Amino acid sequence: LYDMADGHLILKAMVNDGLAPDDTASYLTGGIYTKDRFNIGYGKVEVRAKLPSARSVWPAIWMMPQKGPWPDAGEIDIMEHLNHDRFVYQTIHSRYATTLKQKDPASYVTVQVSPEKYNIYGVEILPDSLVFRVNGWKTMVYPRLEEGMYAGKTQYPFGEPYYLLIDMQIGGNWVGPASGEDLPAEMKVDWVKVYELKDALED
């Protein structure tokens, strides 16, 4: 479910009270993704968005690989927000961090925000690190390990073609059971900017 108003993309989370009679789901959510349409390798992604505060609602801005299994091929969570939290999560997933549960370097950070205001969530995908930002402020650097038994794709699978997802979800083990208590809810996206890393293109 989505709408456009005043140049903003609006992604919705709603109770399915007859809006989609042929859909048996109790709730309906909106989302967009660039899979098989647009790839991002080394570069920078920024999204200016305003988030809902609603029970069991889970808006996210994230990236997944075009090819490869999860979590070995990686996942980059530029922003995830849960319920009525006044902070967001920025997280990476890989075989090293998720399957092997290695905690050095740290794979996530929480960042205080005012979700009801527009904030800019971003990540720089570089050959040697991921750099996360909120409103231009550096929040976490996830470096590529150059030595050790897990150095390489196991720890740092990033830089391969990834696609971007911006979506709303309702319910789950992390955010809690689905609830229509605070619905409908909306995530508003002002703009999305993607930059390619010039040096990587020239290699």
Describe the residue ranges of each PLM region.
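GH16 jelly-roll
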Residues: L1-D203
